Amino acid sequence: MGSIGSMGKPIEGFLVAAIQFPVPIVNSRKDIDHNIESIIRTLHATKAGYPGVELIIFPEYSTQGLNTAKWLSEEFLLDVPGKETELYAKACKEAKVYGVFSIMERNPDSNKNPYNTAIIIDPQGKIILKYRKLFPWNPIEPWYPGDLGMPVCEGPGGSKLAVCICHDGMIPELAREAAYKGCNVYIRISGYSTQVNDQWILTNRSNAWHNLMYTVSVNLAGYDNVFYYFGEGQICNFDGTTLVQGHRNPWEIVTGEIYPKMADNARLSWGLENNIYNLGHRGYVAKPGGEHDAGLTYIKDLAAGKYKLPWEDHMKIKDGSVYGYPTTGGRFGK
């Protein structure tokens, strides 16, 4: 099911390509423009090399890089939609593919920090999904918490797509939210360094298994003179097994066939381990329809705005000061 890295379109389902884009070293706006040109060139080259591909995915930070000294500066921020996303839209339309792109988005409210945003563009050149990272990688990332929820859109081959960004994938509730809204192919774009390589692979698999959906994940690759980024694009089956696993090579293109209908059928026909259903219908053998209240305290507390850990008052790090971010004034807390 795609482990050989197919080049053609399957009879059912679709072919996906995840690009292990080299970590960009960005010091000026010209560098961003160069990255955009490189991404577009890579998109067209991938379509030429894999003519059956219908979805091409680029990792987090591939457009604007990770220059932490400048990533909040106006020079480095983009708008969605904007002239840069129009270039991506034009490329998708020309290549007749769906594309997933990463944008550090200027906040419409200038008093607030920027968003870390992902977009999906369809083969007609339209932005069909816009997602703002719900769980920035605290305490290192300064992005404002996303406010668009977890949107789901139609994709190729009967797929229903959702996108999470990097650390989002460590939050199992977010994958469940996507599946609860119908997602059967969960995309994860990341800019992780090697410290969490194993955990990244683990959660890609668990997010698939817990929700009976495919996961397609890709990370930046290479060295930026500070950290090494592991690449290792991964496609997981809805049973949590890894179908395709990339290596650590920058520019590696990880491809695989995805059959969304198989995930849909599992959700409809499985009894054992249909856990996304069982969560809301526990014990349905003994009680018709099961119990609909899972009785989970943390869910009730989250809904009531009262979420608090037993050890929270004693935690050492609860703001960005360890990485030099302000805790008062400016954009903080706006």
Curated annotation (Swiss-Prot):
Residues in the signal sequence: none
Catalysed reactions, semicolon-separated: formamide + H2O = formate + NH4(+)
Pfam family, one: CN_hydrolase
Enzyme class: hydrolase
Annotated CDD domains: aliphatic_amidase
Active site positions: E60 (proton acceptor), K133 (proton donor), C166 (nucleophile)
Superkingdom of origin: Bacteria
InterPro entries in the record: Aliph_Amidase/BUP (IPR050345), C-N_Hydrolase (IPR003010), C-N_Hydrolase_sf (IPR036526), Formamidase (IPR022843)
EC number: 3.5.1.49
GO molecular function: formamidase activity; N-carbamoylputrescine amidase activity
Gene3D superfamilies membership: Carbon-nitrogen hydrolase (3.60.110.10)
GO biological process, one term: putrescine biosynthetic process from arginine
Keyword set includes Hydrolase: yes
Keyword annotations of the record: Hydrolase
Residue ranges of every copy of the CN hydrolase domain listed in the record: 14-260
Similarity section: Belongs to the carbon-nitrogen hydrolase superfamily. Aliphatic amidase family.
Its job: Is an aliphatic amidase with a restricted substrate specificity, as it only hydrolyzes formamide.
Name assigned to this protein: Formamidase
Phylogenetic placement of the source organism: Bacteria, Pseudomonadati, Campylobacterota, Epsilonproteobacteria, Campylobacterales
Gene: amiF
